[in-house]
Amino acid sequence: MQPEDFAYLSELESDFWWFVGMREITAALLDPVCAPRIDRQVLDDGSGTGGNLSWLKRYAGNGEVAGIDVTAEALSFCKKQGHQLLVQASATDLPFPESRFDLVTSFDVLVQIPEVGSDESAISEIFRVLKPGGIAFVRGAAYEWLKSDHDAALATHHRYSLEELVGKMKAAGFEILRSTYANSFLLPVALVRRLVLKRIGLARGSDVKPMPSALRWVNAPLTAALRAEAAWLRRGETKLGFGLSAICLARKP
């Protein structure tokens, strides 16, 4: 990622439709298996600029939320928000003992690991640091054929099918609780933005950037679209059959 991308992310994470809506979807899946308790230990594996660290405190109660990221620049934004339990480290080599955490989240981190097979190492590390019965929430960008300049700008090296992500979680030893695509309503928009416009040179760079003032009105309806998906996913064992993100919720036996 470029330095300006970290600044954009930090600016947008609190109220930009994608971040707000995807947190709603995360809650829809996590809430049934992470009931409030007073001492849950939580790790955000690849915390970026820290937008999810404060949000994850809802699952920690009086416990702790730790964050790791491979880049010092990203962690500097976390520190500016007052977060202290931060470590600069790779997702493929977590600096924690076995069975340390009750919940580990990985938001679009596996897709940024460049070495072939290293995503499997990262999943194995999540398994290692979780306590028996601990929960893993793993999300990654979906569909390799949807790669675009947005992925290059955000250092996304691979996009997953849901079947591939679930298969790798199972291979690491996880019990799969839920799996689904997400950001489904907006897949047609992404197809136009990233594939059609790209071919005629009108779609370049990352989609993560401040919204022009003339278009800020779309933030609310786009947020509402993702909230509608979250409401659907709260209905028992429902899932979405396609979307821009692949999600796997799993438990360490």
Outline where the language-model segments fall:
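Short, glycine-/aromatic-enriched active-site segment of Class I SAM-dependent methyltransferases
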Residues: 136-158, 164-167
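A short glycine-rich, Lys/Arg-flanked "PGG" loop and its adjoining helix->strand segment in the class I
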Residues: 120-135
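C-terminal lobe and adjacent flexible extensions of AdoMet/dcAdoMet transferase-like proteins
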Residues: 225-253
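Short N-terminal helix/helix-N-cap motif within the alpha/beta-hydrolase-1
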Residues: 51, 73, 114-118, 148
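Conserved catalytic loop of SAM-dependent methyltransferase domains
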Residues: 51, 178-227, 241-245
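A SAM-dependent methyltransferase catalytic signature shared across enzymes that methylate proteins
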Residues: 166-182, 224, 228, 251
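Conserved N-terminal segment of class I S-adenosyl-L-methionine
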Residues: 1-97, 103-107, 123, 243-246
